[in-house]
C-alpha cells in the first residue's frame, strides 16, 4: 500500500505533467473539494440504501485527491492536522457526555 507521501508524489506528478499547477490555487482547490463533495452526495440522492458503489468510490477519490492537493499547496502536514483536530474533538466531545448521542458539543 502506498504511504500518504507516495500518494502526494503521484498526485503532484500527474498535475506537473499536465501543467495544472497554475490552476491549483487554494481557492480553486477548495471550490473543487466542494464540487466533488456535492457529486459524492448526489450518489445518495433520493435513496439512502441503493447506490452505485463504483461511482461513490470515484467521487470519494476526487474529494480526497483535492484535499491532499490543497494541504500540499498550503504546506500542511495532513497527518498532523488530523491528529490536532482529533485532539480538539476529544476535548469537545468527552465520552461520558456524548456516548450514543448526536448532540452538538455546545449543547451537551
Annotate each PLM feature.
Residues 1-60, 64-108:
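Flexible "arm" and connector segments at domain edges
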